[in-house]
Design a protein with these regions (language model features):
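Residue-level detector of Asp-centered blade-edge/turn motifs that repeat once per structural unit
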Residues: 6-11, 64-67, 109-113, 168-171, ...
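Long, C-terminal catalytic modules of enzymes
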Residues: 230-231, 235-237, 244-247
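Long, internal scaffold/assembly segments composed of regular secondary structure
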Residues: 3-5, 14-15, 68, 74, ...
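Signature of short aromatic-glycine-proline-rich micro-motifs recurring in repeat-based ectodomains
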Residues: 1-4, 20, 47-63, 101-106, ...
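Conserved beta-propeller blade signature
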Residues: 12-17, 24, 69-73, 114-118, ...
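Short loop/turn segments that connect beta-strands within beta-propeller blades
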Residues: 27-30, 84-88, 130-134, 187-190, ...
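Short loop/turn segments immediately following the C-termini of beta-strands
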Residues: 18-20, 28, 60, 67, ...
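Surface-exposed loop and turn segments in beta-propeller and other repeat-based domains
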Residues: 1, 30-55, 91-100, 134-159, ...
Length: 277
């Protein structure tokens, strides 16, 4: 299983993606339906045998939009982006720029209703799609994919192996947790039209009189980022627990590990809050 998403209009109704069987639907705590290659808009990667058709329907990156449409990634198929509408009907959006990308981990919508997607595995990167106000007509859409090489503010080119997670902060910037630490896209509005977007590295002064600084979490596998209502950055790592960083990312406010907190492991897979603060 990849992830679950709750129906925003019905907290007893939710969907769960899978790595091969399609999309599971649950209602009132009970299994309701399996959406797969023969009863939905989803496709299988392999179609040579019945077994392969039933076990290679890969679904991830579940996300509802403002109109109640459920978006998802039907990974490793030609038309990766699939949408199930509130009435149960389906459609897909094909983009040549996304063809062949192996796995999408997230689909999120920004304040301007643009779609942001992070690609993982052997072609990691960040994609943005502007639907131009026409949901099912992608002929007028604008799209950009950037990766796996990112240019930072020092004009250094860094090649990443994975984007584990991203999140929007209250200033509109996008913070990305990668296998090489944290990157920040400061100007998402111009990402689609910019042939050379800059992915900023937060610099942490060494404070040793040298005037030198190091990139935030340089060389550290950062597995998750969650930005709270105070605009603070919660950053999960592969083997060093959770760091709570200041709004600008330059100051460590807390560092939680198995030795000083109830964390059962220092390998952090997800971070969220209870919505009460």
């Amino acid at each position: 299983l990849t992830e679950a998403v709750q129906d925003p209009d019905d907290n007893s109704h939710f969907f769960v993606g899978s790595t091969g069987q399609g999309l599971y639907e649950f209602k009132n705590g009970l299994f309701a339906k399996l959406h797969t290659w023969n009863n939905s808009g989803l496709s299988s990667i392999l179609n040579d045998t019945e077994f392969n058709r039933n076990n290679y329907v890969r679904v991830s990156a579940l996300q509802y939009d403002r109109e109640g449409n459920l978006w998802m990634a039907n990974n490793e198929t030609d038309t990766i982006i699939k949408v199930m509408q509130p009435d149960g009907s389906w459609f897909g959006l094909y983009y040549n720029e996304l063809k062949g990308l192996p796995t999408f981990k997230q689909i999120m919508f920004d304040k301007n209703n643009r779609i942001w997607i992070n690609s993982s595995r052997y072609i990691p990167g960040l994609a943005c799609i502007d639907l131009n106000g026409t949901l099912k007509n992608n002929s007028d859409d604008k799209i950009r994919f950037s990766g796996p090489k990112f240019k930072n503010q020092d004009d250094n080119i860094e090649e990443i192996d994975d984007i584990y997670r991203y999140d929007f902060d209250q200033d509109g910037s996008i913070w990305l947790a990668t296998n090489k630490g944290i990157f920040v896209l400061r100007d998402p509005d111009n990402f689609i039209n910019n042939p050379n977007p800059v992915f900023e590295r937060i610099k942490i002064s060494r404070n040793d009189g040298s005037g030198l600084a190091d990139y935030l979490f340089s060389g550290v596998v950062t597995t998750y980022i969650f930005i709270d209502q105070g605009n603070r950055k919660w950053i999960g790592t592969l083997d060093d627990g959770v760091f709570l960083m200041s709004e600008d990312g330059t100051e460590t406010l807390e560092h939680f590990t198995t030795s000083n907190s109830p964390l059962p492991s220092n390998n952090i897979l997800t971070i969220t809050d209870d919505g009460r603060n």
